[in-house]
Amino acid sequence: GEILGIAGISGSGQKKLLEAIAGLQSVQSGGHILYHPPAPDEAIAGQHVPVDRAGEELIGKDPLQIRKIGVSLAFVPEDRLGMGLVGDMDMPDNMMLKSYRAGRGPMLDRRAPKTLAQQVKDELEVMTPSLSTPVRRLSGGNVQKVLVGREIASSPTLLMTAYAVRGLDINTSYTIYNLLNEQKKKGVAVV
């Protein structure tokens, strides 16, 4: 994995670029974004061997289409509560938002999201009175930990963050940077 940073002054397009990659913005013009799924013949005796094959175009696909070709996207938007989490919902319900499509039938499994919420709370040291507290009542740093924790828990192949640590205290920023570096070590592409 690797971490790719996109630099520029606020308003120069970083947010729109990430939203376009995620399939949330239409693309008017520009190049191609290709996904090359790993093939068994690429690794011989631990050495990377380039394989000449066509990639899968991501531009113009919505998030479900992108997922169907094997790209597991995780997106941490700039607007934590407007686009990332539902402020009036608690941690378990916000965890469920990422996984509800994987459910079978009309009934939702409420145990798995509650377990994940507890895991995120414990591992990322989210300060909250209880798991049932609406996330809008948490500090900005704790909201960011909940959001990043949920996205990382989805085991993404591509993790995109818009302003990952904007407005956060130094300790929370350090925690978020460590999480991003851990993902890189696991082979995740971080933008």
What are these model-predicted stretches?
Residues 1-191:
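Glycine-rich phosphate-binding loops of nucleotide-dependent enzymes
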